Amino acid sequence: MIPAIEEVVEHLSRLPGIGVKLATRLAYHLLKRDPAEAQVLARGIACLHERVYRCVCCGAFCEGRTCALCTDASRDRGIICVVERAQDVEMMAGVGEYRGLFHVLGGVIAPLEGVGPDQLRIAALLKRLQESSVREVILALNPTVEGDTTALYVQKILANFPVIVTRLASGIPVGGDLEYIDRTTLAHSLRGRRPLDCSEA
């Protein structure tokens, strides 16, 4: 393989979900296209870190200091939906069933990967609860071992706050990922969320 193509394949194959075969196909596809298209793509990728920030309030991606969801006065400020990743916000907001606010933890507790509670945005969540009149916290974490561990940890901490803590209802398969759940299932899951007893956590 030509070194220039090999270099592109190597970089592309480091991306999640892209193996060497797909990276090779993408590299050759880019070569077939108009060079201007490749330059536009390269500029877009280069500008990502210059133009996209984390919302100072919820941690979602945005192009300013605060995201559109946090500044939307029509949203219910009494409910916060806690998610693992910024892309989960887009998925949940796209359902149309949920009209509250969000909070991105930035990951889940994963001891084998060296991720503990201190590496997550749990302290920021507690600060939000102290500074506002939130009545419900929805734990919308992926139903994996790490997601369940994190949900249990957050549930335990929230026992000290006067809030109802709920978890998404069934319909999301164990080990599933919110990013791949269809909107109808996610909407049913939101409507059927169940309260958690924080005193038993």
UniProtKB/Swiss-Prot annotation:
<dbReference type="InterPro" id="IPR015967">
    <property type="entry name" value="Rcmb_RecR_Znf"/>
</dbReference>
<keyword id="KW-0479">Metal-binding</keyword>
<keyword id="KW-0234">DNA repair</keyword>
<dbReference type="Pfam" id="PF21176">
    <property type="entry name" value="RecR_HhH"/>
</dbReference>
<dbReference type="GO" id="GO:0003677">
    <property type="term" value="F:DNA binding"/>
</dbReference>
<feature type="zinc finger region" description="C4-type">
    <location>
        <begin position="55"/>
        <end position="70"/>
    </location>
</feature>
<dbReference type="InterPro" id="IPR006171">
    <property type="entry name" value="TOPRIM_dom"/>
</dbReference>
<dbReference type="GO" id="GO:0008270">
    <property type="term" value="F:zinc ion binding"/>
</dbReference>
<feature type="domain" description="Toprim">
    <location>
        <begin position="78"/>
        <end position="173"/>
    </location>
</feature>
<dbReference type="Pfam" id="PF21175">
    <property type="entry name" value="RecR_C"/>
</dbReference>
<comment type="function">
    <text>May play a role in DNA repair. It seems to be involved in an RecBC-independent recombinational process of DNA repair. It may act with RecF and RecO.</text>
</comment>
<dbReference type="InterPro" id="IPR000093">
    <property type="entry name" value="DNA_Rcmb_RecR"/>
</dbReference>
<dbReference type="InterPro" id="IPR023627">
    <property type="entry name" value="Rcmb_RecR"/>
</dbReference>
<keyword id="KW-0863">Zinc-finger</keyword>
<dbReference type="GO" id="GO:0006281">
    <property type="term" value="P:DNA repair"/>
</dbReference>
<keyword id="KW-0862">Zinc</keyword>
<dbReference type="GO" id="GO:0006310">
    <property type="term" value="P:DNA recombination"/>
</dbReference>
<dbReference type="Pfam" id="PF13662">
    <property type="entry name" value="Toprim_4"/>
</dbReference>
<dbReference type="InterPro" id="IPR034137">
    <property type="entry name" value="TOPRIM_RecR"/>
</dbReference>
<comment type="similarity">
    <text>Belongs to the RecR family.</text>
</comment>
<keyword id="KW-0233">DNA recombination</keyword>
<keyword id="KW-0227">DNA damage</keyword>
<protein>
    <recommendedName>
        <fullName>Recombination protein RecR</fullName>
    </recommendedName>
</protein>
